[in-house]
């Protein structure tokens, strides 16, 4: 048990360069992909690993409907996406459409809140 604790301590104290070298050794000498090793180690250890693995890390903000104040939604979409006015209007007109794709949960929720406050119907996927 003491040997494992010492090994764990050494592992935690590795520098980025040493971790890179370790990954190379594992791949070349043992045929273990570093990502596969992390999944293999973490998988059986945690009972709720399946639920944690399914938790999304990137979200798409989808405009389902512009609502009554379409002009405000077009301006907000233009501001949030950096698109030109025509592109933002076309995006709002073609609802349901993805406003932003693959963004962090906090950013997606903030964007959703802004759009909903302006009167739009928004969904996170």
Swiss-Prot record:
Subunit annotation: Homodimer. Part of the ribosomal stalk of the 50S ribosomal subunit. Forms a multimeric L10(L12)X complex, where L10 forms an elongated spine to which 2 to 4 L12 dimers bind in a sequential fashion. Binds GTP-bound translation factors.
Disulfide bonds, paired cysteine numbers: none
Protein's recorded name: Large ribosomal subunit protein bL12
Keywords, comma-separated and alphabetical: Ribonucleoprotein, Ribosomal protein
Function, as annotated: Forms part of the ribosomal stalk which helps the ribosome interact with GTP-bound translation factors. Is thus essential for accurate translation.
GO biological process terms, semicolon-separated: translation
MF term (GO), any: mRNA binding
SUPFAM superfamilies per the UniProt record, alphabetical: ClpS-like, Ribosomal protein L7/12, oligomerisation (N-terminal) domain
Family of this protein: Belongs to the bacterial ribosomal protein bL12 family.
GO cellular component, one term: cytosolic large ribosomal subunit
